[in-house]
Amino acid sequence: MNVLQLLGVNRVINAAGAETPLGGSVLPPEVVDEMREASFIFLDMHELLNKAGKRVAELLGVKAAFITAGAAAGLTISAAACIAGKNIAKIKKLPITDDMKNQIVVQRSHRTVFDHAYMMAGARLIEIGKPFIYNKREIEGTINDKTAAIAFTVTGRGIVSLEEYFEVAKHYGLPLIVDAAPVIPPITYPRDLCKNADLVVVSGGKALRGPNDSGIICGEPDLIEACALNAHPNFAIGRPMKISKEQIVGLVAAVELYVKKDENAEINKWFATLRKISEILDSAPNFEKKIVFPDEINRPVPRLHIRIGRNKVWEVIEKLKSGVPKIFTAEYLTMDYYPDSLVIDPTTLLEGDDEIVADRLLELLKSLGG
């Protein structure tokens, strides 16, 4: 039985990066094998989560870790841990938090579509600053007896350093939560972030190539214990964010594989892919092309930028998606950072995809007068 064929759902070409709407990443065969083995047996989920978290923490070089059903779930559970802690009575009340410390301070330029995940736990977000104007004293001015935590997002926007945030958090005895979903590579980044944070949330389904619906909370052991109490399989706010034994085992296997990977060799491969695409597009000389490195959050990830112009770039993006196979590019980068450019991310291109992308793009660019 071929379910995809039965449903009439065809594969797409992912030149956007490891994005949830496109299925995250492609699982290595070793990860699939481990998940398959786990699917045939029953396990004590408390024991599995506990031991899997310890192993992942060891591999990443952090103090403690907890596995979640994706990074967004990790934000919700982190917020719950900061609000309710290990108090069972409070845990059972979430998301009703009126009688608890329930405010989380966040810089306006760090607001994202994902910060509603904090609110799902009953948090009230207290926004500070203008998007690109910030005074450190603004954080201190918002802290009161209802403040539960401070939140930071690893992003290409904002002018507040993580170190400044952490300094304020420590001074007031508040936990600092970092949304670091896409920060790998390098694999050392979560460990480095934990030096200036109490909880760091990382996606398991992006560069790690674990299941798309997996994530990791790294951080201080006491708070990680609180995360576990507020999460599945307990009857808590995290119960609907259930993570299966297959996901847990698959994520551990993915991390085991990744820490043995030669990141520099992979980066060089990405550069070669982009250079190949760029050379094919030389036949459309009217459009400027450049490989940008590092990326917006300073990861060692190269991307190819093709300057098409604000008036035409979305026309090209939509035509790529309407073809067979559909080709998706890094639309969020066009939308948020580079409004006149189409951006190709090589990290999720499969073998042979580069030529298909280049040929289709060349055809479209020539139709625009390239």
Briefly describe each language-model feature range.
Residues 36-48, 216-217:
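An acidic intrinsically disordered interaction segment
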Residues 11-21, 29-39, 299-304:
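Generic N-terminal amphipathic, Lys/Arg-enriched alpha-helix
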Residues 37, 51, 55, 269-276:
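A non-catalytic, amphipathic alpha-helix used as a structural packing/dimerization or gating element
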Residues 234-235, 321-328, 363-369:
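A common structural junction motif
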Residues 45-50, 64-66, 238-242, 261-270, ...:
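Flexible, glycine/charged-enriched surface loops at secondary-structure junctions
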Residues 3, 282-360:
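Conserved C-terminal alpha-helix-loop-beta "cap" of PLP-dependent enzymes
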Residues 1-27, 48-259, 263, 278, ...:
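Conserved PLP-enzyme active-site core in the AAT-like
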Residues 244-307:
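Active-site pocket-lining segment
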